[in-house]
Regions:
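Hydrophobic, helix-forming membrane-interacting segments
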Residues: 2-82, 89-110
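Ser/Thr/Pro/Gly-rich low-complexity linker/stalk segments immediately outside membranes or between
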Residues: 41-45, 108-130, 134
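An alpha-helical repeat/solenoid feature that recognizes helix-turn-helix modules
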Residues: 95-98, 112-119, 145-177, 194-244, ...
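Buried hydrophobic core positions in alpha-solenoid tandem helical repeats
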Residues: 128-132, 184, 188-189, 250-254, ...
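Alpha-helical repeat scaffolds
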Residues: 304, 364-377, 449, 453
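Short, solvent-exposed mixed-charge patches
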Residues: 494-497
């Protein structure tokens, strides 16, 4: 008999119940922590960095709770067997130790890993895809805002949403959303300006075509006929019609290129009318359309000349220490447009994946631009809502009458450009994810791009406040940014239909 007084049966029962409760609590805590939706919710509420710290603290608490619980359970079993034969006690205690040790090891193994930024990114991408197409308007278009019931539909927003949904979706999503996607494309087709030279205005009733809107329409249509998607989005008999639409947009874009190689916001041609955003979207359109291989009416020579001239204009108008600015013709400037610079670099990276345009995309100013961008000091501290807007003086197009002997490209009324906001976060994320695979830069710079990609992805939870303003263009551009994931040594050249 033991020399120690044996606790009362009631005390032993209470001790056993407490041990079991503690073990259940620890196990429940780890099970709950392993649910991705709960992790996503917590990340939304407190942010990725705070959640990582919380995870470390909770892991320590859970481990301590499990150790105490299983130690207490072992001691409880010992107390219950205190009066039994020594051989029985030894056998039962040995079995209990084996079982409890196994449970302890298993429980430790089940402790959830730290929050995964890529898993969170995938969750947000799905949420944003569904949000963009959740409430289609009667005309099939996407409204400028998801928070205002009376918000108008807009081709610009619709095209951005289509591109975003298409490049971010897996097959199951595309099948589920295919009908809505087709309806949105029909809205774009029905909203064209019928008078020459055509195109799309800021809203349906606006009769001046805008280059960047045509560019977005083009990259959306090109995404829909990508070889991995076309059979899901379109019926076989519809595919040729979509290629005809792409051909029409390409012809429009090519016909409105300025003599200096850039593009202006409208079809009007004239000195100093080229703008960076217009040129970026027009060049991107041509790159994506060329890649589809489904526009035989547009010869390679036309693509080569237009894209080469567009890229050359962009690289020529890069400004050291500033990057790209919306209107390079304004002489004295000291404002950095990080979002615009990131988007230009992203488009140059797309050009670089094609053997047709690799040499021009890596021409003068390309490497300095990439190096300066990767060295930008404010990626970690800049608020996601701290975005640059077009300067007031850059919104007004100066109308210059062409010489009598020079045919005008269109009869264009005075025009005011929309005061666009250039979102820095999504395009910076897209750019660094591409730069991480760029073989034209040094290995240390690729590593820096990879580190920036992880750091920016870790800040994705900060997007909620900006997303919740309700503007669908923000949702679309963020969705494009988080969906860029170019494989190593990607070489995407002209495909086959």
């Amino acid at each position: 008999m033991s020399s120690h007084p044996r606790p009362s049966p009631r005390r032993i029962r209470r001790f056993g119940a407490a041990s079991i409760a503690l073990g259940v609590l620890g196990t429940a805590a780890q099970a709950i922590g392993n649910i991705q939706k709960i992790q996503t919710f917590v990340t939304d509420v407190i942010g990725s960095k705070a959640f990582k710290n919380l995870h470390l603290a909770l892991t320590a608490v859970v481990v301590a709770a499990l150790i105490l619980a299983y130690a207490a359970a072992t001691y409880w079993i010992y107390l219950k067997l205190q009066s039994r034969d020594i051989r029985i006690r030894i056998a039962v205690m040995a079995l209990a130790l084996v079982l409890l040790s196994g449970l302890a090891v298993g429980s430790y193994a089940l402790i959830p890993p730290p929050p995964d930024p890529d898993a969170y990114r995938a969750e947000k991408a799905k949420e944003w895809r569904d949000r963009l197409l959740a409430h289609p308007a009667e005309d099939g278009g996407v409204k400028v805002s998801f928070s205002e019931a009376q918000a108008p539909t807009q081709v610009w927003t619709t095209a951005q949403a289509l591109r975003a949904v298409l490049v971010s979706s897996v097959d199951a999503d595309l099948k589920r959303l295919a009908a809505r996607l087709r309806s949105a494309f029909d809205f774009i087709e029905d909203s064209q300006i019928r008078a020459a030279p055509g195109g799309w205005g800021y809203f349906k009733e606006w009769q001046t075509g805008v280059t960047e809107i045509a560019g977005w329409v083009c990259v959306a249509e090109a995404a829909s006929v990508d070889a991995t998607r076309r059979d899901i989005v379109w019926a076989p008999e519809q595919v040729s019609r979509i290629f005809d639409r792409i051909t029409h947009v390409v012809q429009l874009i090519v016909s409105t290129q300025q003599h200096d190689g850039g593009w202006g916001p409208t079809a009007q041609r004239g000195a100093d009318l080229s703008r960076t955003y217009s040129t970026t979207l027009a060049t991107w359109c041509l790159i994506e359309a060329h890649r589809t291989g489904g526009t035989p009416l547009i010869p390679d020579s036309t693509y080569d000349r237009a894209i080469t001239d567009g890229i050359t204009w962009l690289l020529t108008n890069y400004r050291q220490s500033l990057g790209w600015v919306p209107n390079p013709h304004r002489k004295i400037q000291n404002e950095r447009f990080l979002g615009l610079t990131a988007q230009v670099l992203y488009v140059l990276e797309q050009a670089q994946t094609s053997e047709h345009f690799k040499s021009v995309a890596t021409g003068p100013n390309a490497l300095p631009a990439k190096k300066e961008f990767l060295a930008a000091p404010d990626f970690g501290s800049r608020s996601l809502g701290d975005n640059d807007r077009l300067h007031d003086s850059d919104r007004y197009l100066r109308i210059v009458s062409p010489p009598v002997s020079t045919p005008a490209s269109c009869t264009c009324p005075p025009f005011t450009i929309e005061a666009s906001t250039f979102l820095w976060y999504p395009w910076s994320l897209a750019a660094v994810r591409s730069l991480a695979f760029d073989q034209t830069i040094e290995a240390t710079q690729r590593a820096a791009a990879e580190n920036l990609s992880r750091a920016l992805t870790g800040r994705l939870s900060e997007a909620s406040e900006l997303i919740d303003t309700g503007f669908n263009y923000i949702v679309a551009e963020f969705l494009i940014g988080v969906s860029e994931n170019r494989p190593p040594n990607a070489s995407r050249d002209r495909g086959k239909t």
